[in-house]
Amino acid sequence: MRECISIHVGQAGVQIGNACWELYCLEHGIQPDGQMPSDKTIGGGDDSFNTFFSETGAGKHVPRAVFVDLEPTVIDEVRTGTYRQLFHPEQLITGKEDAANNYARGHYTIGKEIIDLVLDRIRKLADQCTGLQGFLVFHSFGGGTGSGFTSLLMERLSVDYGKKSKLEFSIYPAPQVSTAVVEPYNSILTTHTTLEHSDCAFMVDNEAIYDICRRNLDIERPTYTNLNRLISQIVSSITASLRFDGALNVDLTEFQTNLVPYPRIHFPLATYAPVISAEKAYHEQLTVAEITNACFEPANQMVKCDPRHGKYMACCLLYRGDVVPKDVNAAIATIKTKRTIQFVDWCPTGFKVGINYQPPTVVPGGDLAKVQRAVCMLSNTTAIAEAWARLDHKFDLMYAKRAFVHWYVGEGMEEGEFSEAREDMAALEKDYEEVGADSAEGDDEGEEY
């Protein structure tokens, strides 16, 4: 088996976790108490969904997941919510006081009190796996727990499970809306610390998702539930190939192999289509060609940046539902002729395709329409550097005046860590610039890696 353990850190991670597990349960026909009426073989480990669920002797399916937060309120909602019976109480780990939007508290002072407990629980989950494939870590960049504790956890996971892949789903601070003033600090500190420990990080920017909800789903004032349900659809598309059998199945390690040309350049851009409300879907065809084209619209991306200004290094199209390879090939051929999509010259237009016959499931009473087919595109493009540049600029404005730095130093950090992290980010921006540059200029660029 190729099991995956999901780790949900901090408020954002936990709430996205709720949306994801709700959707997984619907997709696999698992009831909120973990029973699965359709599954007659108790203890049979041959079904694909067992990558995400373990099965007890009593036939109860338990998510291979850990929820961690340094303060209890958010996870208490899981403990009392609809899915309270789904999780083992030991999988829901809470501290007493929160990280107060402070990376240093999450990483040093408060985080270190709880890290061993968390690793112990993860170890128990890992011991139940026959062939652990890797970890999916969900967190935000802006929060104290999401940034500080996640980076601590990633460092420790690298030590304990050296070769296992670690994929992140990170909530990137939105360009316009902000939930905390110190988001740029936390984001840059966590990116710097996690850069060498993460194999692949899918970033999601709340503002981009807000816009999609407003524009495509006609929700005037999207709530976090709306956002998280949309994010969970994307996560579900990415993980569908691990949980269902399909024609062209994609494995966790396959993502990395196909999307990450250099170890540091591991931030693919996710795009999902069709995001459409039930009223509209009723009148539309949504052919393979249409949804494939929609993936190349900046409006459907999960991070605000413009790939038309950047170059693509790799592209992965994950289809699910009623899709045949013939249609996919035709759609891709059309896109290649358009020439609006520029690939770097050292990577001929490679599209990796995954097809899964399980149609997309929607949460009843949710906003998304039930459709026959959907596609999630993961593309590694140099345009994502725009997102880093934006964040770095905000960091610089605050750090020039050393604003808020004393909160971090007071928790045992040193100012040097800030400048070190910022230099690393500058190097990352430079890496993106060099990858996008034409290789004809000089062949001596390969020495860095």
UniProtKB/Swiss-Prot annotation:
<comment type="similarity">
    <text>Belongs to the tubulin family.</text>
</comment>
<feature type="binding site">
    <location>
        <position position="228"/>
    </location>
    <ligand>
        <name>GTP</name>
    </ligand>
</feature>
<dbReference type="GO" id="GO:0007017">
    <property type="term" value="P:microtubule-based process"/>
</dbReference>
<keyword id="KW-0479">Metal-binding</keyword>
<dbReference type="GO" id="GO:0016787">
    <property type="term" value="F:hydrolase activity"/>
</dbReference>
<dbReference type="GO" id="GO:0005525">
    <property type="term" value="F:GTP binding"/>
</dbReference>
<dbReference type="InterPro" id="IPR017975">
    <property type="entry name" value="Tubulin_CS"/>
</dbReference>
<dbReference type="InterPro" id="IPR018316">
    <property type="entry name" value="Tubulin/FtsZ_2-layer-sand-dom"/>
</dbReference>
<dbReference type="GO" id="GO:0005929">
    <property type="term" value="C:cilium"/>
</dbReference>
<dbReference type="InterPro" id="IPR008280">
    <property type="entry name" value="Tub_FtsZ_C"/>
</dbReference>
<feature type="binding site">
    <location>
        <position position="179"/>
    </location>
    <ligand>
        <name>GTP</name>
    </ligand>
</feature>
<dbReference type="GO" id="GO:0005634">
    <property type="term" value="C:nucleus"/>
</dbReference>
<protein>
    <recommendedName>
        <fullName>Tubulin alpha-1C chain</fullName>
        <ecNumber>3.6.5.-</ecNumber>
    </recommendedName>
</protein>
<dbReference type="Pfam" id="PF00091">
    <property type="entry name" value="Tubulin"/>
</dbReference>
<feature type="short sequence motif" description="MREC motif">
    <location>
        <begin position="1"/>
        <end position="4"/>
    </location>
</feature>
<feature type="active site">
    <location>
        <position position="254"/>
    </location>
</feature>
<dbReference type="InterPro" id="IPR003008">
    <property type="entry name" value="Tubulin_FtsZ_GTPase"/>
</dbReference>
<feature type="modified residue" description="3'-nitrotyrosine">
    <location>
        <position position="449"/>
    </location>
</feature>
<feature type="modified residue" description="Phosphoserine">
    <location>
        <position position="439"/>
    </location>
</feature>
<dbReference type="InterPro" id="IPR002452">
    <property type="entry name" value="Alpha_tubulin"/>
</dbReference>
<dbReference type="GO" id="GO:0046872">
    <property type="term" value="F:metal ion binding"/>
</dbReference>
<feature type="binding site">
    <location>
        <position position="71"/>
    </location>
    <ligand>
        <name>Mg(2+)</name>
    </ligand>
</feature>
<dbReference type="InterPro" id="IPR023123">
    <property type="entry name" value="Tubulin_C"/>
</dbReference>
<keyword id="KW-0342">GTP-binding</keyword>
<comment type="function">
    <text>Tubulin is the major constituent of microtubules, a cylinder consisting of laterally associated linear protofilaments composed of alpha- and beta-tubulin heterodimers. Microtubules grow by the addition of GTP-tubulin dimers to the microtubule end, where a stabilizing cap forms. Below the cap, tubulin dimers are in GDP-bound state, owing to GTPase activity of alpha-tubulin.</text>
</comment>
<keyword id="KW-0944">Nitration</keyword>
<feature type="modified residue" description="N6-acetyllysine">
    <location>
        <position position="40"/>
    </location>
</feature>
<dbReference type="InterPro" id="IPR036525">
    <property type="entry name" value="Tubulin/FtsZ_GTPase_sf"/>
</dbReference>
<keyword id="KW-0460">Magnesium</keyword>
<keyword id="KW-0378">Hydrolase</keyword>
<keyword id="KW-0493">Microtubule</keyword>
<dbReference type="GO" id="GO:0005200">
    <property type="term" value="F:structural constituent of cytoskeleton"/>
</dbReference>
<feature type="site" description="Involved in polymerization">
    <location>
        <position position="449"/>
    </location>
</feature>
<keyword id="KW-0597">Phosphoprotein</keyword>
<feature type="modified residue" description="3'-nitrotyrosine">
    <location>
        <position position="282"/>
    </location>
</feature>
<feature type="binding site">
    <location>
        <position position="145"/>
    </location>
    <ligand>
        <name>GTP</name>
    </ligand>
</feature>
<feature type="modified residue" description="Phosphotyrosine">
    <location>
        <position position="432"/>
    </location>
</feature>
<comment type="subunit">
    <text>Dimer of alpha and beta chains. A typical microtubule is a hollow water-filled tube with an outer diameter of 25 nm and an inner diameter of 15 nM. Alpha-beta heterodimers associate head-to-tail to form protofilaments running lengthwise along the microtubule wall with the beta-tubulin subunit facing the microtubule plus end conferring a structural polarity. Microtubules usually have 13 protofilaments but different protofilament numbers can be found in some organisms and specialized cells.</text>
</comment>
<feature type="binding site">
    <location>
        <position position="206"/>
    </location>
    <ligand>
        <name>GTP</name>
    </ligand>
</feature>
<keyword id="KW-0007">Acetylation</keyword>
<keyword id="KW-0963">Cytoplasm</keyword>
<dbReference type="InterPro" id="IPR000217">
    <property type="entry name" value="Tubulin"/>
</dbReference>
